[in-house]
Amino acid sequence: GKPFRQAKMAISGAAGEGKYWCSLGAVLDANQDTPVNSGGGEGGMPPADWDVVYRRDPIGVVGLISAWNYPLNVAFRKVAPALIAGNCAILKPSEIAGLSCMFIAKLAHDAGIPPGVFNIVTGDRDAGAALALSPSVSMISFTGSSLTGSRIMEACAPKLSQVALELGGKSAMVIFDDVDLDMAVATTMKGFLTNGGQICTAHTRLVVQAGIQDELLKKLKVELERLPYAEDPITEKDRGDRAWEEGKSDVVQPVVCKSQQQKILSFIDAARESGIEVLTGGGVPDVTNPSGYFVEPTVLNNVPRDS
């Protein structure tokens, strides 16, 4: 379900992040055991007769739970700093996007990282829960849903483990009546369709000034309903295929897997049942030889603020 260009960019992005963390590792090493001025702090701390040095020690064993929408980047963003800081790392990739994370293990092996320093545990939520609850794991870094993140924080609290959470949400565009409507529609679609809409910065919530709501939604509906669907990116038979390969945002990409497709459709059905207007979309498109799990671009109108 990931556009080819996005996947290619992930490789170069992960390499760039690796270089960045390596540079910080050099700074960390250079500063270890350097003297800290005594007697000049607030309240005379530390006292002038103390010998104080700067030192940062590894945390120990860290559990790293990564997301499926950017599996290589998110995993590398966790693994690289953990190892460079001298920790042992256990990576638990998403069960629906684990192959690129397995490749990180090969890179670690080829680089000569000793056995047991970098490890991968595959599995679903039970594997992640085992990491969070383990008394041998001193820190958890998690990227994913807010609900799961809160549960991880609860699991780590009794053992006072460190926790780093990057949690999802519904990012909003706020549109006022002095805007160029065509530009607003184009910008909305770009965010809505990037990476198949499976990104934390997707413009999936519109807060529109009342005076322009109807006209904006009319334009948005027209543009969404004429979007092509991506087909097999290998054959590149039509515009949809070429757009997928080139990473353009004017084509509907599939979602990551069937369970995610069904989850999205269930949310739309729940909206219908609660009386929310489905302005366009809301189902599975009738496309020829679909190459993935598609959901029609969907607009829900007049959604309650507390939903």
Where do the language-model regions lie?
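N-terminal Rossmann-like NAD(P)+-binding subdomain of aldehyde/semialdehyde dehydrogenases
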Residues: 1-48, 226, 248, 256
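A generic "alpha-helical surface" signal
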Residues: 9-12, 16, 73, 95, ...
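Alpha-helix boundary recognition
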Residues: 9-12, 19, 122, 132-133, ...
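Short amphipathic alpha-helical/adjacent loop interface patches that line ligand
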Residues: 11, 15, 79, 101, ...
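Mid-sequence acidic-hydrophobic segments that form the walls
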Residues: 21-28, 65-68, 191
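Rossmann-like NAD(P) dinucleotide-binding subdomain of oxidoreductase/dehydrogenase enzymes
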Residues: 30-183
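ALDH superfamily catalytic-core signature
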Residues: 139, 147-305
